[in-house]
Regions:
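Short beta-strand segments that buttress and anchor functional surface loops
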Residues: 31-33, 154-159, 190-193
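Extracellular or lumenal secretory-pathway regions
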Residues: 17-136, 142-145, 152, 197-281
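Short, solvent-exposed secondary-structure boundary/capping segments
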Residues: 176-181, 213-217
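Extended beta-strand-rich segments in extracellular/periplasmic secretory proteins, especially
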Residues: 128-170, 176-178
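A generic structural signal for short beta-strands and their flanking turns/coil linkers
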Residues: 101-103, 163, 184-188
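A recognition module on extended beta-rich or small alphabeta surfaces enriched in W/G with H and D/E
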Residues: 184-190, 196-199
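Sec-dependent N-terminal signal peptides
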Residues: 1-13
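Extended serine/threonine-enriched, polar tracts that run as long, contiguous segments within proteins
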Residues: 166, 174, 191-196
Length: 281
């Protein structure tokens, strides 16, 4: 409860410091998210709490844990709190309350700018940004129906970014949106998962009042480093797996050449045990 209250207070503070308010939110969906960190042995399931905040002209999707982490570490008072919580976690050997990044560093902004999806990510210790055309997903409707959070839902399937997705959309909520980059159905997606169940999003709460506005976050107030989707994803995989010299990684090389950051730690080469969410790069 204390974490939730603190998060709400920081939400208002961050919006006041570095932000672009896009539009008032009309509905917000909270999803329980699971991903397999080891898709071979399936022994490491990571969980997260994701937020989809929807307005009339744009929406945003992000990890609540990552937002909490970024809010703390990019605020002078919050940094002191984060350091105290981190030290306490090590002292107690209990890291459950330590500020941490969730399953992803990504913040997604749909239809911002119009007809585009913008992603920001600070995994390379510099706030990177790329945008892409709003995905056109070829969904195939099925006859299966079920109820989620009291809403009648219909099933649809599609191949998207190298995965076979199943989505359940609410037929009584005519909002063409959903978790992550999924959307394009005649109703709000309340559950989605890929064929191997490596990634799953399940709605656990729908909120329609007292909402924060849909807001484009810039936590440190510095300009974003712009790139493109495939360059970012290729570089991310190479960085995480320690492939080759860190300064030969495409995006890191560009960041260093720009002067935004000078040094990166060389990671030990290893095989990633999980498949990234997107496979088409």
């Amino acid at each position: 409860m204390k974490t939730t209250v603190f998060l709400l207070l920081f939400s208002a503070q961050v919006v006041a410091q570095h932000h672009t308010r896009l539009n008032p939110a009309t509905i917000e969906v909270h999803y329980h998210h699971t991903m397999q960190r080891d898709t071979v042995r399936r022994l490491a399931t990571e969980t997260d709490s994701m937020i989809l905040r929807i307005g009339a002209s744009a929406s945003q999707f992000f990890s609540r844990h990552t937002f909490y982490y970024d809010s703390l570490w990019n605020d002078p008072d919050g940094r002191a709190t984060a350091e105290a919580l981190t030290l306490e976690a090590f002292r107690m050997r209990n890291h459950s309350k330590e500020p941490r990044v969730g399953t992803t560093y990504d913040y997604l902004y749909k239809n911002y700018p119009a007809g585009r999806v913008t992603t920001t990510n600070e995994q390379f210790h510099v706030a990177c940004r790329y945008d892409e055309a709003t995905p056109s997903i070829s969904w195939v409707m099925a006859d299966s129906i079920r109820t989620i959070l009291g809403h009648p839902c219909r099933m649809a399937t599609a191949d998207f970014r190298g995965r076979r997705w199943t989505a359940w959309f609410a037929t009584d909520i005519p909002v063409s949106d959903g978790p992550w980059k999924l959307g394009g159905l005649p109703g709000l997606i309340l559950e989605a998962y890929d064929r191997g169940d490596d990634y799953r999003y399940t709605a656990v709460r729908i909120v329609e009042s007292g909402l924060q506005p849909v807001t484009f976050y810039c936590f440190d107030g510095k300009p974003f480093f712009d790139t493109d989707r495939r360059t970012f994803l290729r570089s991310q995989r190479a960085f995480l797996s320690g492939q080759g010299n860190v300064y030969d990684i495409e995006l890191i090389r560009a960041i260093v050449q720009s002067g935004r950051r000078k040094t990166y730690m060389q990671r030990e080469a290893h095989r990633l045990l999980f498949d990234p969410l997107e496979r088409d790069y």
